[in-house]
């Protein structure tokens, strides 16, 4: 193979990153995306069928000799300008056809193809024409968490989300819930970067072409659970969870339960104090969201026990929020307790954090995951008719682990399975495409993780196959 600098080297040497790379690449090519297809075949499936035969050698080279992100870029460029034109551009750059494959297998590929063919930057992500489309006007949303506390991180994220085809972003602030019941129960938002940066972030998202839902996101302060306690909190053993909460509260003298959707007060005075404190926390966010021009506001997240027990207090609070924020409102109910909530008529959307269990089987098939969505969404459709409100999946997502379909809310430090995460996304989007009464979804989570993304077991989708799946559905069709 003749390299661009004129050197001629054995083909294997042209791609080698380290002495063990070629055997590892062969194993990667032979590996399977869950129980579906070899990795290379999965990538080729993102291209229109007519282009697959001519694209196969180049894409397999890209996959074998670099990482999955480079292969995604190559697939995007090939779909944008067509394989013959792409290879012609690379031949012109590299000098010969065999070198075109070398260059296609590098980060240079997408930029060089666009430069030589005049394709726009960024290139649209390839659409799978055989798939059904999302309903017209569907809110193609992604959740972005302000944990980094930097507006420049938001700007870069919003531009990339727009390039993937997203139309909405849910900006999650990050605020700590105080340890005790002395006022204020909630930290003052103006002391936290989540509040200080909100206006700039909303404007950055708008500049990128995205609409914005502001979603205050509370976390606990003064208590850091162990890994075992986290497992119990997120698990399905309700007796173990109740025992753990009781034990921690006894140690801390705390009257509010630790889980947001399990909040309980000791007496009426504590309830009044809780609502006064929460109102003083959330109203500044509503005012700031209005001033920044945000398009939607979420009045609360996964505090369902308070909504069920104190509906009148929540209705009064919603009225106060409407006086500050003039756009549509929703509340984000948890997937396992939303049916007990009756105040949807006071809001504009039924909002659900949709971490529904879809399948108990390890590595479930696409059909099994879709069947899980059929079961989960049937009660929501009935509620939408009964309350006369459309539904938003205010959160939906899956960790990159083998149990993603069984417990989508739970993250574990285990071997990553990014292909099951992508399959869960595909099943979710197929389910949403058939349900026009669902007006949108905000997928959790757009957050950069420590590289390589291929080994990250979290919910984050940056540089993972799930982001490519999302872009196939969100992008131009």
Residue spans for each PLM region:
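Aromatic-rich peripheral "rim/lid" segments of glycoside hydrolase catalytic domains that contact
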Residues: 124-132, 237, 244, 408-410, ...
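Boundary/entry segment of secreted carbohydrate-active catalytic domains
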Residues: 124-161
